[in-house]
Amino acid sequence: MGKNVVVLGTQWGDEGKGKIVDLLTDKVAAVVRFQGGHNAGHTLVIEGKKTALHLIPSGILRQDVQCLIGNGVVLSPEALLKEVRELEANGVAVRDRLKISLACPIILRTHVRIDQARERARGNDKIGTTGRGIGPAYEDKVSRRGVRLGDLCNPADFEIKLREIMSYHNFVLTEYFKEEAEDIDAALEELRQMGEEILPMAADVTDILHDYRKRGEHILFEGAQGSLLDIDLGTYPYVTSSNTTAGGTATGSGFGPLYLDYVLGITKAYTTRVGSGPFPTELFDDMGKHLAVKGNEVGTTTGRSRRCGWFDAVALRHAIQINSVSGICLTKLDVLDGLETVKVCIGYKTPNGEITRPPIGCDSYSDIEPVYEELPGWSESTVGLTSVDQLPENAKAYIRFLEEQIEAPIDIISTGPDRVETITLRHPFGE
């Protein structure tokens, strides 16, 4: 009987999901993206060779795996075709192994323009978006005026819808932001041409998923960004525009929640965040710089440096609860190698006393101070270890302490970027 596993980030993104998805795909028939867009960034290292993916599921590097993009993903045709061509240039077959939901909203040129204009207008109060049109595309989806991939199947109707929505966007650009209008005719022709390449890959992804389920195949659902960036449950308004938590799996793919068997939460051994927003354990000293340099903390999608801090057990307990996490994969343990001591945030100090759950709303974070537990570090290297018995005793103690604090088992430990640099204590697919 097949198992259906969700892999998602439990911090603010960049937890190392791509490697773990790639690691687990040797067991699956299909890998599915269910939310976000090309604002995601997954770097895979296979036998020393790096591959960066933003939209196509990480399973594409496994030749027998079907890759699916669900209806919850907002689709940039340009980004999709660029990624397809780059993979093909490296000898990876894509077009016969990738299926994209006909219900995917399309990201238009004007979505990108509006996204970037808004960020400029916010000045110092910017959200920190990637500027790729993700948010405006989701807005149009919710407002029921967006165009979807399936609309390209009817060119006449598509033109009517596109002219209507881009006229509205141009009004916003010219009248509110005082910027130049976008050429609708040029956008229409460009989308028609790209549609000719993309439509052969379009399909009813929900139906395909349930066919795999009925055949008893393993399916893996690949989350993007991180749980603390969820539009509803994250540090609003410094969040992304989609549901990055486990609930988004069902709505973004049409695969009912009762069919999901295991939720794997990916978590760094410390904490990072890109862009603006609350970050209670952020370090502004040499230790923060050390983590950033040793962890190579630069965003795959944006190229921006990530903010770094100690492990936040308070935030992680929240993420585990809202996702019904079955087990944790701890990544980048090796970044902590060589430190005399390591710290874990176990609570937040507020003017009204200590709390052990994150507050709701960003304003409540302004008076928060982290409460730390300090543990002894380890001088030995953990890089490339494949057995828990090989770990230094203090590293084992650190892992046990984290499990106690977050109230969840650590089932996988990543000890390096390559798929083979992994310690598996309990396999999500039970194998």
Swiss-Prot record:
Binding site for substrate: T300, T301, T302, G303, R304, S305, R306
Positions bound to Mg(2+): D14, G41
NCBIfam families per the UniProt record, alphabetical: PRK01117.1, purA
Cofactors (names): Mg(2+)
Enzyme Commission number: 6.3.4.4
Domain of life: Bacteria
Molecular functions per Gene Ontology: adenylosuccinate synthase activity; GTP binding; magnesium ion binding
Name by which UniProt lists this protein: Adenylosuccinate synthetase
GTP-binding in keyword set: yes
Subcellular location: Cytoplasm
Active site per UniProt: D14 (proton acceptor), H42 (proton donor)
Pfam families reported in the protein's UniProt record: Adenylsucc_synt
The record's free-text note on cofactor binding: Binds 1 Mg(2+) ion per subunit.
Signal peptide: none
Top-level enzyme category: ligase
Pathway in which this enzyme or protein is active: Purine metabolism; AMP biosynthesis via de novo pathway; AMP from IMP: step 1/2
Organism encoding this protein: Marinobacter nauticus (strain ATCC 700491 / DSM 11845 / VT8)
Keywords in alphabetical order: Cytoplasm, GTP-binding, Ligase, Magnesium, Metal-binding, Nucleotide-binding, Purine biosynthesis
The keyword Ligase belongs to this UniProt entry's keyword annotation: yes
GO CC list: cytoplasm
Catalytic activity: IMP + L-aspartate + GTP = N(6)-(1,2-dicarboxyethyl)-AMP + GDP + phosphate + 2 H(+)
Main location group: cytoplasm
GO biological process: 'de novo' AMP biosynthetic process; IMP metabolic process
Residues annotated as binding IMP: D14, E15, G16, K17, N39, A40, G41, H42, T130, R144, Q225, T240, R304
